[in-house]
């Protein structure tokens, strides 16, 4: 049902891995540290389905203007999150596995190649990765790309808090759930070492 009625997808920093980054409909993270194309897509969308999102200021920015041209459907297991930060026209409360299954069954298959082409053009135009020059210092993106080549989709990536955390969220391609450990909401400095030890203890074979 990924392509039935939803034409593109983006994620919060904490949601990375919930949808494969290699999928052609995945755009990246949204918000002040996100990709340009996700902001453009959200601003021009006619329908936004928010799944388990809380619309923090880092994601929504000016909450009064977020998705102002779109019908917003907000899905969450906690009804306290509904309309707390961004007003939605419709809401679905419950386990997301059930609510998403129900919603997908109601969707009609539609195609909008012009919209997908426009998004593709935004992505190509605003690629933030600088060209690598071995005579200069490596950019953080080049280091993250190297780490990507040395790891698998099942490996767990842990960061601390700061600029490197945002670089990883922007550039590392997470393919599976629970492979990304970071302190996004609280932003706790020093989180990384303890989280890495915990992840290794819980997953001794990784």
Q: Which residues does each predicted region cover?
A:
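Beta-sheet entry/capping signal
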Residues: 8, 46-48, 71-72, 155-157, ...
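General beta-strand structural signal in soluble alpha/beta enzymes
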Residues: 10-12, 50-51, 94, 157-161, ...
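Glycine-rich, acidic loop regions that bind phosphate or pyrophosphate groups
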Residues: 15-118
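Short helix-capping/linker segments at secondary-structure and domain boundaries
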Residues: 107-110, 202-206
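Active-site diphosphate/adenylate-binding microenvironment
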Residues: 120-205
């Amino acid at each position: 049902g990924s392509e039935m009625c939803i034409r593109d997808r983006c994620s919060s920093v904490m949601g990375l891995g919930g949808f494969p980054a290699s999928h052609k409909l995945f755009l990246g993270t949204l918000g002040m540290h996100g990709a340009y194309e996700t902001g453009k897509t959200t601003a021009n969308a006619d329908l936004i389905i928010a799944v388990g999102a809380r619309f923090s200021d880092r994601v929504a920015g000016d909450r009064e203007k977020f998705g102002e041209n779109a019908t917003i459907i907000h899905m969450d297991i906690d009804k306290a999150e509904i309309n707390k930060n961004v007003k939605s026209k419709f809401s679905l409360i419950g386990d997301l596995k059930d609510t998403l299954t129900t919603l997908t069954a109601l969707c009609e298959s539609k195609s909008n190649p012009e919209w997908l082409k426009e998004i593709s053009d935004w992505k190509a135009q605003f690629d933030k990765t600088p060209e690598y020059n071995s005579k200069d210092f490596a950019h953080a993106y080049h280091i993250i790309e190297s780490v990507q080549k040395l790891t698998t989709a099942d490996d767990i990536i842990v960061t601390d808090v700061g600029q490197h955390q945002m670089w990883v969220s922007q550039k590392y391609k997470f393919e599976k759930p629970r492979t990304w450990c970071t302190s996004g909401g609280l932003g706790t400095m020093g989180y990384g070492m303890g989280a890495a030890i915990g992840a290794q203890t819980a997953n001794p074979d990784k």
